[in-house]
């Protein structure tokens, strides 16, 4: 289980631009749950992910992974148990290295191993079999530089790499936002399959309300550091895009927009 307990986060403390984003914010995510997170810009979505991954530190509260407080763990240490796929397809992979080299690095993440271990014939065959179900032809492009791939191919590779080693949590940070609609649908189908087959606990931040409704078994809507909507199970399955738009409009009116 992942628990964010009584978190407080202040940006630009002691300045005229000081902003308290989270004040006593708590969230518990059981093992195996796939959570979709929506909300307007500045609502706290990405900050929540950054707090979990260790990119930023809280000013109070706890972040517990399987009951252990991980606040003192570096971002690098947390990455052993947390896979993250970013909005930018260029992140999460190395453009100047080949697909094979990227897969090798991901395969031995956290282990004292060099690239030569990834060139073993059995590993190469295994990589091809991992890539084949993607349906993007990557299994025949192992020697190609990642920088030559399309955005969709690169994002699919990043998703695969982030889940190659045993992880506890998968963080999806608007990972389809930079893709065209058709490619985004392909990546979302792949995402759903990977989460389901590997039985991962996943948190997906998205601006695509259709994806938020169609994927996952829990939905959160964030606003100014608070969860203004939290539905799981059958209640989540009953949520429609129109329901989300209604809440967005109500919030907009309250804020004077």
Residue ranges and their predicted role:
Residues 1, 10-24, 74:
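A short, flexible loop at the N-terminus of ABC-type nucleotide-binding domains that lies
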Residues 38-40:
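The feature captures the beta-strand-to-loop junction immediately N-terminal to the Walker
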Residues 53:
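Helix-to-loop junction immediately C-terminal to a conserved catalytic motif
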Residues 69-83, 113-116, 120, 236-242:
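ABC ATPase NBD coupling module
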Residues 174-175:
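Walker B catalytic motif
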Residues 206-207:
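H-loop/switch region of ABC-family ATPase nucleotide-binding domains
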Residues 226-250:
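Conserved beta-strand-loop-alpha-helix hinge in the C-terminal portion
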């Amino acid at each position: 289980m992942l628990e964010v307990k009584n978190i407080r986060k202040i940006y630009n403390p002691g300045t005229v631009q000081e902003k308290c984003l989270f004040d006593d914010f708590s969230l518990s995510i059981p093992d195996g749950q796939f959570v979709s997170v929506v909300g307007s810009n500045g609502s706290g979505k990405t900050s929540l992910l950054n707090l979990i991954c260790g990119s930023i530190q809280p000013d109070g509260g706890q972040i517990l992974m399987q009951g252990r407080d991980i606040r003192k763990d570096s971002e690098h240490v947390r990455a052993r148990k947390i896979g993250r796929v970013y909005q930018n397809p260029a992140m999460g992979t190395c453009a100047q290295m080949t697909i094979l080299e990227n897969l090798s690095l991901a395969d031995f993440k956290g282990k004292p191993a060099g690239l030569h271990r990834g060139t073993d014939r059995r590993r190469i065959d295994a990589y091809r079999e991992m890539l084949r179900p993607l349906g993007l032809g990557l299994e025949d492009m192992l020697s190609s530089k990642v920088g030559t791939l399309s955005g969709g191919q690169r994002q699919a590779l990043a998703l695969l790499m982030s889940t190659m080693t045993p992880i506890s949590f998968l963080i999806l940070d608007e990972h389809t936002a930079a893709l065209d609609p058709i490619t985004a649908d392909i990546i979302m189908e792949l995402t759903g399959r990977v989460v389901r087959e590997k039985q991962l606990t996943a948190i997906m931040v998205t601006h695509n309300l259709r994806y938020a409704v169609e994927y996952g078994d829990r939905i959160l809507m964030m606003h100014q550091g608070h969860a203004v909507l939290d539905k799981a199970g059958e209640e989540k399955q009953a949520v429609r895009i129109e329901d989300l738009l209604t809440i967005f409009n109500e919030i907009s009116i309250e804020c004077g927009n």
